[in-house]
Design a protein with these regions (language model features):
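NAD(P)-binding Rossmann-fold cofactor-contacting core
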Residues: 1-10
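Short secondary-structure boundary/capping segments
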Residues: 4-5, 21, 71-72, 96-99
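Short, structured coil segments at secondary-structure junctions
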Residues: 10-11, 75, 129-130
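Short acidic-hydrophobic, aromatic-tinged amphipathic segments that line or gate anion-handling sites
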Residues: 13-19, 135-137
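Rossmann-like NAD(P)-binding element
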Residues: 17-51, 55
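Glycine-rich, N-terminal phosphate-binding loop of Rossmann-like dinucleotide-binding domains
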Residues: 32-34, 60, 110
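Rossmann-like NAD(P)(H) cofactor-binding subdomain of soluble oxidoreductases
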Residues: 41-94
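Internal alpha-helical scaffold of NAD(P)-dependent oxidoreductase catalytic cores
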Residues: 100-190
Length: 191
């Protein structure tokens, strides 16, 4: 309840169910949930949203998988993939940073079935309403590039932490750690 109370205090309108959200008939609905929850959320949204009105997008870091999940529930005609290239190792409402997306680059992913007005709705949200920048890609190109510059650093960072924890001299190594260690392992703190 605390994140909702804080959000409400900050002037953000909160709803407690997907049905209540769908009742607001948003122009653009941005899914900001963990990727593993996507199939369940998409399945629950399908009978609730008016796809003639609402364009569906998400901020997931993997686009091809999400598009397949969107297709599996029959929402592909109203979907445009999006991935803001901004973030940090923190999570939760209390960790939010109002400047995190300032000037951020968003990858918008489309395919041959993406409707132009859907693309335009998401692009307008990103550029006009959020003052951000965008690049348009196909899902596969996005996923390969995101793996290289975002996912691989997470894997390497986690491997470094695991190596330290398993090392019998971990306390000495931790005492010697400085800026390079901090910078290389920061993203391992994500959940």
């Amino acid at each position: 309840d605390r994140p909702y109370e804080t959000a409400k205090a900050d002037g953000i309108r909160c709803v407690s169910t997907l049905a209540a959200l769908a009742d607001t008939k948003p122009d653009v609905l941005v899914l900001c949930n963990p990727l593993k929850a996507m199939p369940q959320i998409l399945g629950a949204l399908k009978p609730l949203i008016d796809t003639d009105i609402t364009t569906l997008t998400d901020v997931g870091s993997v686009k091809a998988m999400v598009r397949e999940q969107v297709k599996a529930v029959g929402l592909e005609h109203c979907y445009v993939g999006a991935h803001p290239m901004a973030g940090n190792e923190l999570s939760g409402w209390e960790s939010s940073d109002p400047t995190l997306y300032d000037g951020a680059l968003w990858a918008i992913t489309v395919d041959e079935n993406t409707e132009y007005q859907r693309f335009r709705a998401v692009a307008t949200m990103i550029v006009d309403h959020c003052s951000n920048r965008l690049i348009v890609l196909d899902d596969a190109t996005h996923d390969r590039c995101a793996a290289l510059i975002s996912h691989m650093p997470h894997v390497i960072s986690t491997a470094m932490i695991n190596e330290l924890v398993a090392n019998p001299n971990r306390n000495i190594a931790a005492a010697l750690a400085a800026g390079s260690w901090r910078d290389m392992t920061r993203v391992a703190l994500t959940d």
